[in-house]
Amino acid sequence: METFFNNSFATLIAYIGIISTYLLVIPLFLFYWMNNRWNVMGKFERLGIYGLVFLFFPGLILFSPFLNLRPKGSGKG
């Protein structure tokens, strides 16, 4: 068991897991949450979301060119 903890492969897997969670999983969840709840959030929920946006800003920047959070139009135009 001790060789597992001293193994550089296990360390690499742990780093990949932490970085992918920080840069991919949580920012995508935040985008989903903000897109669905933006107009009905309470003040404390909005404050919490703003804090999470500040905390996970690098991951949100990675996805910002690909995701559109603008309101949907009425279809006329």
From Swiss-Prot:
Q: Which Pfam family, giving just one, matches this sequence?
A: NdhL
For membrane topology, the record states: Multi-pass membrane protein
NAD as UniProt keyword: yes
Q: Which reaction does it catalyse?
A: a plastoquinone + NADH + (n+1) H(+)(in) = a plastoquinol + NAD(+) + n H(+)(out); a plastoquinone + NADPH + (n+1) H(+)(in) = a plastoquinol + NADP(+) + n H(+)(out)
Keywords of the record: Membrane, NAD, NADP, Plastoquinone, Quinone, Thylakoid, Translocase, Transmembrane, Transmembrane helix, Transport
| Enzyme Commission designation | 7.1.1.-
* Role, per record: NDH-1 shuttles electrons from an unknown electron donor, via FMN and iron-sulfur (Fe-S) centers, to quinones in the respiratory and/or the photosynthetic chain. The immediate electron acceptor for the enzyme in this species is believed to be plastoquinone. Couples the redox reaction to proton translocation, and thus conserves the redox energy in a proton gradient. Cyanobacterial NDH-1 also plays a role in inorganic carbon-concentration.
Per UniProt, subunit arrangement is: NDH-1 can be composed of about 15 different subunits; different subcomplexes with different compositions have been identified which probably have different functions.
Name of the molecule in the record: NAD(P)H-quinone oxidoreductase subunit L
Q: Which organism is it from?
A: Prochlorococcus marinus (strain MIT 9215)
